[in-house]
């Protein structure tokens, strides 16, 4: 009898998709809102993103287990909406892979620079090596991604605990709550945090993979909840210990670099005395990027395989691998962009397929099928709220992009 996949394994895949972006982007994007309001924004986003993932599961439940986001959207909403959704999914998945590739190349280059100086080509070389080595797991199979994700989550857990222990020992409550800060109006900055927070829970392109993996909706539902729950817990602890160590006004150079990870790590290193803690934070950050790179890569890989109708043979998977990983790598080499800026763009576009499309799919599905075995509670109220949340986040990003929202610069 074939062994059933564990819910924990699926939760680790979902968490691994989420954690990279959040760990790297949330502290900087939340610097204006600071501790309390950052926590409010992160928690609200987690709840909405979990429910919208469940809405997708409900929409999928009347289709074959191999049916993908693209297949269901085309059948329910038509070719035009599906084309828009396809572009949005690929844009977000691609820009996340691009951001992780660029960030990883920069970290690897800095790590080896004391021994090997690759000069002006260092970032491109390190980014290419990173992609060629770690995209292999996605090419191989979902099962190996499951196993690697579990190993990475365990490794992240160990390095996270050591990092948090070291950082927590030096937390200053005055720093954590910005006592005596020059500016005490935090709430106005919380709105601008939502695009990054939404991207931090953007696992939805992996929902069809989870359903196919388990062969049912109920286990996939719990895997999604477990994954977003793991991500939320890690995010809150991570943000709190960073805000408790790194004063609010010291985020200025991080903002100036558009939230680049190496600048954040260097800033943290300047306030941490223990070399062991510094090394653990670096190791944790690399594992967070790698886990998210693999998780996002799996979702985009399966999505494009269905879109282009590539089969599951080695040749077919190689074609899927090329269209998944090569375009982001080429863009990373030619146009390296600030990490936080890239994540913000991803968040704005992700509202289409994390909020708006799932709600519309369920609305159409319920009109077509009066009853289904798997059904999310909340009625039309949840559908409307999910759409409004997505529209709100998209508007926030574009207002911030044109400087119509308060922007904290340290």
Regions from the PLM with identified roles:
Residues 156-166, 289-299, 323-327, 346-371:
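Hydrophobic alpha-helical segments of multi-pass membrane transport proteins
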Residues 64-79, 229-289, 310:
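TM-loop-TM module centered on a large, flexible mid-protein loop between adjacent transmembrane helices
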Residues 1-28, 50-54, 66, 189, ...:
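Membrane-interface "cap" regions at the ends of multi-pass membrane proteins
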Residues 9-18, 86, 111-141, 155-163, ...:
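Transmembrane alpha-helical segments of multi-pass small-molecule transport proteins
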Residues 27-58, 230, 407-410:
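Extracellular loop-to-transmembrane helix junctions
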Residues 51-62, 66-117, 282-306:
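Hydrophobic transmembrane alpha-helices that form the core helical bundles
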Residues 2-7, 120-129, 216, 226, ...:
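Loop-to-transmembrane helix boundary motifs in multi-pass membrane proteins
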Residues 116-129, 140-143, 150-266, 405, ...:
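Helix-loop-helix junctions that connect adjacent transmembrane segments
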């Amino acid at each position: 009898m074939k062994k059933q996949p564990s819910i924990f394994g699926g939760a680790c895949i979902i968490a691994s998709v989420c954690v990279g972006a959040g760990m790297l982007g949330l502290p900087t994007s939340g610097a204006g809102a600071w501790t309390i309001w950052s926590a409010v924004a992160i928690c609200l986003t987690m709840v909405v993103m979990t429910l919208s993932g469940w809405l997708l599961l409900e929409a999928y439940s009347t289709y074959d287990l191999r049916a993908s986001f693209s297949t269901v959207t085309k059948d329910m909403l038509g070719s035009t909406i599906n084309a828009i959704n396809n572009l949005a999914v690929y844009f977000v998945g691609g820009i996340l892979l691009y951001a992780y590739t660029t960030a990883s190349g920069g970290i690897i280059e800095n790590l080896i620079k004391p021994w090997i100086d690759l000069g002006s080509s260092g970032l491109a070389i390190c980014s290419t090596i990173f992609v060629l080595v770690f995209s292999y797991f996605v090419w191989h199979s979902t099962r190996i991604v499951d196993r690697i994700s579990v190993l990475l989550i365990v490794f992240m857990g160990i390095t996270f605990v050591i990092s948090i222990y070291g950082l927590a020992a030096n937390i200053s409550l005055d720093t954590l709550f910005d006592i005596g800060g020059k500016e005490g109006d935090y709430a106005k900055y919380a709105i601008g945090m939502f695009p990054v927070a939404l991207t931090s829970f953007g696992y939805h392109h992996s929902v069809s993979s989870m359903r196919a993996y388990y062969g049912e909706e109920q286990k996939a539902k719990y895997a999604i909840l477990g994954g977003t729950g793991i991500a939320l817990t890690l995010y809150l602890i991570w943000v709190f210990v960073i805000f408790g160590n790194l004063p609010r006004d010291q985020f200025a150079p991080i903002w100036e670099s558009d939230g680049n990870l190496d600048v954040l790590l260097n800033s943290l290193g300047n306030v941490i005395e223990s070399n062991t803690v510094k090394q653990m934070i670096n190791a944790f950050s690399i594992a967070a990027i790698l886990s998210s790179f693999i998780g996002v890569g799996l979702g985009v890989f399966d999505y494009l395989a269905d879109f282009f109708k590539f089969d599951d043979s080695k040749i077919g998977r190689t074609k899927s691998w090329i269209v998944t990983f090569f375009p982001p790598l080429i863009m990373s080499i030619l146009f390296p962009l600030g990490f936080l800026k890239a994540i913000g763009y991803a968040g704005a576009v992700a509202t289409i397929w994390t909020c708006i499309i799932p709600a519309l799919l369920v609305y159409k599905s319920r009109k077509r099928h009066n009853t289904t075995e798997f059904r999310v509670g909340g009625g039309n109220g949840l559908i409307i709220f999910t759409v409004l949340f997505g529209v709100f986040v998209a508007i926030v990003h574009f207002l911030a992009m044109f400087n119509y929202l308060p922007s904290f610069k340290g």
